[in-house]
């Protein structure tokens, strides 16, 4: 049986990246929360 986590930089960026976050309302809210908290890194 293969492991569930098969790392891929492209997939990672496309699902969790900044532009992916900005594309949806929920994603924008995530970024807003992280800005309010003062996170150094907002998205991947």
From Swiss-Prot:
Disulfide bonds: none annotated. One of its GO terms (cellular component) is ribonucleoprotein complex. Keywords: Ribonucleoprotein, Ribosomal protein. The keyword Kinase does not apply. The keyword Ribosomal protein applies. One of its GO terms (molecular function) is structural constituent of ribosome. GO terms for biological process: translation. InterPro entries: Ribosomal_bL34 (IPR000271), Ribosomal_bL34_CS (IPR020939). Belongs to the bacterial ribosomal protein bL34 family. HAMAP family: Ribosomal_bL34. This is Large ribosomal subunit protein bL34. The gene is rpmH.
């Amino acid at each position: 049986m293969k492991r569930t986590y098969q790392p891929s930089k492209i997939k990672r960026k496309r699902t969790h990246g900044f532009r992916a976050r900005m594309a949806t309302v929920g994603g924008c809210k995530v970024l807003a929360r992280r800005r309010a908290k003062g996170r150094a890194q907002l998205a991947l």
